[in-house]
Amino acid sequence: MKKYLKDYEYKILYKRIIFTCWILLIYIFGTHIPAITTVRTYTAISNFYKMTAANVGGDYQALNVFSLGLGPWLTAMIFMTLFYYRDSDRMMKQTRREKSTKERIFTLILALIQAYFVVFTLLSHVKIDHSEKWLIILVLVTGAMILVWLSDLNMRFGIAGPMPIVMISIIRSIMRQNVALSELGPTLLISAALVLIIILLVLIFIEITEYRLPYLDVMDVSSRREHTYLAWKLNPGGSIAIMISFAAFFVLNSAVNLIVQFFNSKNNGVLNFLDFSTPIGITIFLILQLVLSYGISRLILDPKRKAKDFKKNGDFFPGVEPGKPTYHYLIHKARRISWIGAFIVTIIIGIPLYATLLIPQFSKEIYLSV
């Protein structure tokens, strides 16, 4: 019987791997279908936008069916979750279909905004009619919704949800970058390597660091006096907050440019202040990263649910009364942990981004390392 169950598990795993491979083949095939039949499109989008688009499965090197990637969906999903954060009971009462419908509508709106900005930026110097541009926008939005559907299918029948698509996109982006390490010089290479090692050690420290809150377990009647504690990671959001911040910043950039072009039709260019080549753009992005990282950490820690679990089980913290005092105690601790983790991650990302302003000739290499 045990052998039969083991063989059955391997068979299920095998089917899931095959299904994910088919999803990736469809994604790769879609990236080779151009949305416009030109040899090369002029792009006013910086290299950093191209690389960050790859982090969510997008591609701004040349317009194809899946150029928008999963950015609109990931942004919509996290903002919907943050919107219902204070009313989690209402969110729990919703059916899967209701949640999915609201996410898809929000994703469609964000995809439309992002597609408009991308098309009118990439094709600003290509002589085509406005009707053709709107047709390309329709193709991009349709491709984004198809990619969301494929990711949802892979989440149900495949492995790791949208992550295989993102990984393939990142690999394609890295292979396109022509990074000439020989031009950097030995001093700069050694300095960059030391900085990367220090950042890597800090990231490992953040990953393994836990903030422990000791509590008394009333159900523990064993004679062994083992310490029971509530363990929270310093950065529970991990890389999710960074990925979402890139997608949200690009959507913000798209929305601002769309509003400016709507009220000022003579301005067909791209606003430079929301770009990583300016200190204002980097600062706005880091503020967005700080806020989103804090919000996602609070969302994952979920002190409200923890307080309910403690009240239900009868557990309590030393010196803290059960009920509302426990809830306020957990809120205070979760707020402190979330801010500390968000500040550390923001500083780690901010240092190399501000470094691109001092040495812009190596901005591509720094963007690639980020």
Curated annotation (Swiss-Prot):
UniProt cross-references to Pfam families, sorted A to Z: SecY
UniProt topology in membrane: Multi-pass membrane protein
GO BP terms in the entry: intracellular protein transmembrane transport; protein targeting
Entry keywords, A to Z: Cell membrane, Membrane, Protein transport, Translocation, Transmembrane, Transmembrane helix, Transport
This protein's record includes keyword Mitochondrion: no
Signal peptide location: none
GO cellular component: plasma membrane
Disulfide bond entries: none
Matches recorded under InterPro entries: SecY/SEC61-alpha, SecY2, SecY_dom_sf
Residue ranges of the TM segments: 17-37, 65-85, 105-125, 134-154, 155-175, 188-208, 240-260, 276-296, 339-359
UniProt KW Ribosomal protein keyword: no
Cell compartments where the protein resides: Cell membrane
Function of the protein: Part of the accessory SecA2/SecY2 system specifically required for export of possible cell wall proteins. The central subunit of a protein translocation channel.
Subunit architecture: Component of the accessory SecA2/SecY2 protein translocase complex required to export cell wall proteins. May form heterotrimers with SecE and SecG subunits.
Family in the record: Belongs to the SecY/SEC61-alpha family. SecY2 subfamily.
Protein name per UniProt: Accessory Sec system protein translocase subunit SecY2
Taxon lineage: Bacteria, Bacillati, Bacillota, Bacilli, Bacillales
Name of the gene this protein is made from: secY2
